[in-house]
Amino acid sequence: MINSLLTRVFGSRNERQLRQLTRLVTQINALEPTIEKLSDAELQAKTPEFKQRLAAGESLDKILPEAFAVCREASRRVLGMRHYDVQLIGGMVLHLGKIAEMRTGEGKTLVATLPVYLNALQGEGVHVVTVNDYLARRDAAQMGKLYNWLGLSVGVVYPGMPHSDKREAYGSDITYGTNNEFGFDYLRDNMALSRADRYQRTLHYAIVDEVDSILIDEARTPLIISGPADESPELYIRVNRIVPQLTKQESEEGEGDFWVDEKGKQVHLSEAGMGHAEELLLQAGILENAEDGLYAAQNLSVVHHLNAALRAHAIYQRDVDYIVRDGEVVIVDEFTGRTLSGRRWSDGLHQAVEAKEGVPVQRENQTLASITFQNLFRMYKKLSGMTGTADTEAYEFQSIYGLEVVVIPTNRPTVRKDHPDQVFLNRKGKFNAVLADIEDCAKRGQPVLVGTTSIETSEMLSEHLRKAGVKHEVLNAKQHEREATIVANAGQPGAVTIATNMAGRGTDIVLGGSLESEYHALGEDATEDARFKIKTDWQRRHDAVKAAGGLHIIGTERHESRRIDNQLRGRAGRQGDPGSSRFYLSLEDNLMRIFASDWVQKAMRMMGMKEDDVIEDRLVSRQIEKAQRKVEAHNFDIRKNLLDFDDVNNDQRKVIYAQRDELLDAESVKDNVDGIRGDVIYDLVARFVPPNSVDEQWDVKGLEATLESELGVTLSLTDMVRTQEEIDAEQIAAKVQAAVDAHFAEKEAAVGNDTMRALEKHVMLTVLDQGWKEHLAKMDYLRQGIYLRGYAQKQPKQEYKKEAFELFSEMLENVKREVIHLLARVRIRSEEEVAELEEQERLHAQARLMASQFQHQDVGGYGTDEEAAQVQSGNAPVPVSQVTRDEPKVGRNDPCPCGSGKKYKHCHGQLS
């Protein structure tokens, strides 16, 4: 009550911030007459002037009014677009490192030019992050004209571009790209073996377009660079034949072999199902011993494959969760409806789906490097974002990213009519009403956009409309190549467009059709008469559509998130245009079936509702919104939990990447190697000759044998121990140290200082990377089983932190040992020996090629020749992309970032 009273008196925090920023807008507008009088050359000269002022110590905030005024005037001259006052406010919000919520059609792309120009003046690089490559290239091309005119360089990064071009793009003042590309480039940079192979500079400032999609929707999926593991995918094919023989039960207490937890997207075997599955696996020869049981330790791999196959069959649906294209299973993004080429599900799920669909099963992947978007974007010194729908997730933005959401008022009042939801008993009744609404709009010449949650639904509606003779377009992951054309025509009079969520973002639907597209089709050489005719025809269509009520939005199902529903609604009513929206629901929809209260369904059935009967009731709408809030809270918990675990990995990642940076920057790592060698020898001697021990406890022969086998050093210690009475463990350690040092000095003398320094650096980087890769695999296994600690009354997160620290310390010790072992045993060959070895390898390669081309296949027990061929020909996954940030250097006497409480030099700085 007090908060409500204070808000009425002083206004909400959002209103107070807008009032403060409006004062700056007044200053910018006051500068406009002066800026307008400047010639082009004088206006362009402002950029170097601003840079000089910043170098002299002036702040960005101080030059903001003038820089914004310059950018606005340059935009008017170059692009023919002048920023509105509300767009200036949006630009200031972005500069302040906050999220600007701006409705569809308010010109977010133009808004971003203001803070991008201002922050690019510092020369440290600005990243503009978009949701797909098309938008990145489009915006870089369109807005690049403005930035280039103002004297700033612009680059765009995309998958597969040449290394030199990508380095140049990252060296530009402004770089456009997708969140995936920036993230994968960061990971790639931290796998590079030389500075010259790296792309990025420091992570200075990022503006994230459609920030809710990237930082919320995609936060549950970490970016992973992976390589194929050694395990054969054949077991997925064999287990896949068994799953169709298992029976699904309707609930946990029902009869059958397994039940599905749709909320958690998991499948659970019943008691009977375990026995039945065990029997089938024994018959197929997958389980070897009936006495061991399915859950015996040696069968855990089979359980993993069985669970993956059950999820593939019972939960993941073709044309909903994925499509099959050119013999590959391609994931469909549940939030955007776009295909995610190059992305693969983890934990064997992708292989299980491939086996289910009968396409070549690729090998399971091993993680080489990974990071979540949460930890990636939190590394930027300053982060901001813009979207049309952020306010519903304001708490998450604030709690995880420290980003405040500021709602920017529209330039013109929104006049869109949002009609109440209509709820039907079943899907048939719902779709009858949807089809009737579409046909009515088409007859009246009102364009309609029909939003669906799956490809399957969009194609089903398309089939019904085709039979009814209604001309329409379908936009889903299968037709994504035609997206720009379909969206450009979606505002034509009477146009019917059926779309998955992918139509919800990026491109405005203009009433009457896209005038820009028609101008572009004419070409630059078109006469003024031709352009005038196009404009006249468009204006006539535009007015006709406005008279018919503007764009009408039909939602065929509520999404789990209110934000996605709001995005669909937001396609209509842009810039004060008329428009309308309505959602059609049924009790069979996933959201209603899984999350809505049972009493809603019971009440509707008790009322004797028939198939085509409809309910429009606020109480039902409130229940639907309550269900959505439940799902949003559930998904937030998942993302928060992911972050809690990844923060442990992130601390370790920072340590490893900081050490890699030190190694890459160092002229020589000889001091590092010498220090590590001392530690390794001390530990080695202590294994056989413990400190403060008597000679009866010593294993001198074991020490001699280990020195020979692990370090290639022949040293006789037995005689020394036998002949010297006063000898102790320290003297033995000193003798071993001297012998190993001499061995290394001899090796260096043979190959030369420069070669040895290069070899040391290469070995340290290679071994560190291999150790980190193996450590990531161990961390994955630890994480998968950590929840079982809860049964022992232990906190899984605390146990994860503790065991992850132990694994990390063990990994660093192993890296130190491996570096010294490799350097001690490496042999530098002469040029003649190298030539001979290369010739031998060439002959071996030819023999392997002949063997693979003419390999004879043994008769399989259960598989077909086709399935065997699929296993043999599985394509290795294409590695995906990365981003770099130089963290503040950790001093050797500073506390270690891993949280152990030790000094860095005594903990994870030991390699340094």
Swiss-Prot record:
GO-annotated biological processes:
intracellular protein transmembrane transport; protein import; protein targeting; protein transport by the Sec complex
List the subcellular locations: Cell inner membrane; Cytoplasm
Region feature (Disordered): 865-912
Gene3D superfamilies membership: Helical scaffold and wing domains of SecA, P-loop containing nucleotide triphosphate hydrolases, SecA, preprotein cross-linking domain
Q: Name one GO cellular component term.
A: cell envelope Sec protein transport complex
The cofactor named in the record is: Zn(2+)
Catalytic function, reaction form: ATP + H2O + cellular proteinSide 1 = ADP + phosphate + cellular proteinSide 2
| Principal subcellular localization | membrane
Enzyme Commission no: 7.4.2.8
Which portions of the chain have biased composition (kind: Basic residues)? 902-912
Which Pfam families does the UniProt entry name for this protein?
A: P-loop_SecA, SEC-C, SecA_DEAD, SecA_PP_bind, SecA_SW
Per UniProt, the keywords (alphabetical) are: ATP-binding, Cell inner membrane, Cell membrane, Cytoplasm, Membrane, Metal-binding, Nucleotide-binding, Protein transport, Translocase, Translocation, Transport, Zinc
Q: What class of enzyme is it?
A: translocase
Residues reported in the UniProt entry to bind Zn(2+): C896, C898, C907, H908
Keyword flag Protein transport: yes
Query: InterPro entries annotated for this entry?
Result: Helicase_ATP-bd, Helicase_C-like, P-loop_NTPase, SEC_C_motif, SecA, SecA_CS, SecA_DEAD, SecA_motor_DEAD
Give me the residues that bind ATP, please.
Q87, G105, E106, G107, K108, T109, D508
Q: How is the cofactor bound?
A: May bind 1 zinc ion per subunit.
The UniProt entry lists membrane topology as:
Peripheral membrane protein
Family that this chain belongs to: Belongs to the SecA family.
User: What is the protein's quaternary organization?
Assistant: Monomer and homodimer. Part of the essential Sec protein translocation apparatus which comprises SecA, SecYEG and auxiliary proteins SecDF-YajC and YidC.
State the protein's purpose.
Part of the Sec protein translocase complex. Interacts with the SecYEG preprotein conducting channel. Has a central role in coupling the hydrolysis of ATP to the transfer of proteins into and across the cell membrane, serving both as a receptor for the preprotein-SecB complex and as an ATP-driven molecular motor driving the stepwise translocation of polypeptide chains across the membrane.
Protein known as: Protein translocase subunit SecA
Question: What species is this protein from?
Answer: Xanthomonas oryzae pv. oryzae (strain KACC10331 / KXO85)
Q: What is the lineage of its organism?
A: Bacteria, Pseudomonadati, Pseudomonadota, Gammaproteobacteria, Lysobacterales
